[in-house]
Design a protein with these regions (language model features):
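Structural micro-motif
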Residues: 47-58
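Local sequence-structure signature of Cys/Sec-based thiol-disulfide redox active-site neighborhoods
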Residues: 1-24
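Thiol-based oxidoreductase modules, predominantly thioredoxin-like and allied folds used
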Residues: 30-43
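Non-catalytic, surface beta->alpha helical segment in thiol-disulfide oxidoreductase systems
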Residues: 58-81
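Generic recognition of short, well-ordered alpha-helical segments
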Residues: 16-19, 45-49, 71
């Protein structure tokens, strides 16, 4: 499983969400997390899309977001195999 977390470097909620997400990782089923800083990303559309919503977590970029601001543990667990 792969998660994408849209974030900002100075955002304490972003770090909190990442920390909480990593705590959900089962030892036998590892997942990856790509953290994308919307302020430094070459994709300038991310800033317009996620500016006031960060942190925003996706499990599959083709699907709606899993959560923003705070980790939705139930939504994340539904994504895990």
């Amino acid at each position: 499983m792969h998660f994408t977390l849209y974030s900002r470097s100075y955002c304490h909620l972003c770090q909190d969400m990442l920390d909480a997400l990593l705590l959900l990782q089962p030892p036998d089923k590892l997942f990856t997390v790509e953290v994308i800083d919307i302020d430094t990303s070459p994709d300038t559309s991310l800033l317009a899309r996620f500016d006031e919503l960060v942190p925003v977590l996706f499990g599959d970029l083709a699907q709606p977001e899993l959560c923003h601001y705070f980790l939705d543990e139930a939504a994340v667990r539904r994504c895990l195999p």
